[in-house]
Amino acid sequence: MNRPLGIIGAGAWGTALAIAAGHAGHPVRLWGRDTAAVQAMARDRVNRRNLPDCPLPDPVQPQPDLTALVAECDDLLLVVPSRAFESMLHTLAPLIERRHRLGWATKGLDAASGGLLSQVVQRVLKPLPPLAVLSGPSFAAEVGRGLPTAVTVAATDQGFASDLADAFRYERFRVYTSTDLVGVQLGGAVKNVLAIATGVADGLGFGANARAALITRGLAETRRLSEALGADPDTLTGLAGMGDLILTCTDDQSRNRRLGLALGRGEDLDEAVEAIGTVEGVRTADELHRLATQAGVEMPICEQVHLRLAGRVSTREAVENLLLRPGGRQEQ
């Protein structure tokens, strides 16, 4: 890609990815909804709100005009919360031309249908551009500080996957390519729900054994769903599956894990969310419940998280429901 990469979404994750691409020497245009904040980034060369200790490399140019960004860039990467994903697509739809290719680094599911974000794109954009999704074990603050990170890019077009990987790849940010959009999307979405579950177990003081069991059984649940939806089950043993799951379930930088910890300690759900901020797993739990039900896939850990967040069981009841389940055959 000789033209700049357009990153749409200037939160912590969008800014971190812009920094990574900048360190890779690739020109970037970075847009955010808050025009004043984007102008401040252009002036101060730092995102003071989200990544105050991570200066922007020279190739990164904040752009407050979305129309100008889309006109200048052939390749676009959406990095917005899942709740804003569809509305952002509708904003982009009249601006996208045949030359454009569209990727996203949003982790979650469609709020309207419980389906994959790729299905939202297929519903909104006509004709459909080449698509890609970037996912993997990656906290924004660590990427922004240049700490070693590895992620996966899955795309409908191998050329797009390679170009997007090249835009980000440098010695501190490794990018692997895939063709499995379904598996990569599921890994990034389901892990947020499972991180709440492992946080609850740790908040209750259940220990390392229980945490390991939840991670392992949670991976099996994700694998069952991915197979039902036509994904490659091996994707879930890679960065976008197991890698992201382990990171999110074991490190307190994860907001989803921190919410689980709070619930395990007996704190109020609404108060915990208000204190932590946006917790993607809260929305995803309900969406995942619908997706698994439609696919006819049993996901007991994710189901208990859904029931707890919906207020239909207490934290203690959710845990007991899992502990009282009969044992079965070990699944791959």
Swiss-Prot record:
InterPro entries for the chain: 6-PGluconate_DH-like_C_sf (IPR008927), 6PGD_dom2 (IPR013328), G3P_DH_NAD-dep (IPR006168), G3P_DH_NAD-dep_C (IPR006109), G3P_DH_NAD-dep_N (IPR011128), NAD(P)-bd_dom_sf (IPR036291)
Biological process terms in GO annotation: carbohydrate metabolic process; glycerol-3-phosphate biosynthetic process; glycerol-3-phosphate catabolic process; glycerophospholipid biosynthetic process
Cellular location(s): Cytoplasm
EC numbers, comma separated: 1.1.1.94
Domain of life per record: Bacteria
Sorted UniProt keywords: Cytoplasm, Lipid biosynthesis, Lipid metabolism, NAD, NADP, Nucleotide-binding, Oxidoreductase, Phospholipid biosynthesis, Phospholipid metabolism
Binding-site list for sn-glycerol 3-phosphate: K107, G136, S138, K191, D244, S254, R255, N256
GO molecular function: glycerol-3-phosphate dehydrogenase [NAD(P)+] activity; NAD binding
One cellular-component annotation, GO: cytosol
Reactions accelerated catalytically: sn-glycerol 3-phosphate + NAD(+) = dihydroxyacetone phosphate + NADH + H(+); sn-glycerol 3-phosphate + NADP(+) = dihydroxyacetone phosphate + NADPH + H(+)
Family: Belongs to the NAD-dependent glycerol-3-phosphate dehydrogenase family.
PANTHER family per UniProt: GLYCEROL-3-PHOSPHATE DEHYDROGENASE, GLYCEROL-3-PHOSPHATE DEHYDROGENASE [NAD(+)] 2, CHLOROPLASTIC
Biological function: Catalyzes the reduction of the glycolytic intermediate dihydroxyacetone phosphate (DHAP) to sn-glycerol 3-phosphate (G3P), the key precursor for phospholipid synthesis.
Entry protein name: Glycerol-3-phosphate dehydrogenase [NAD(P)+]
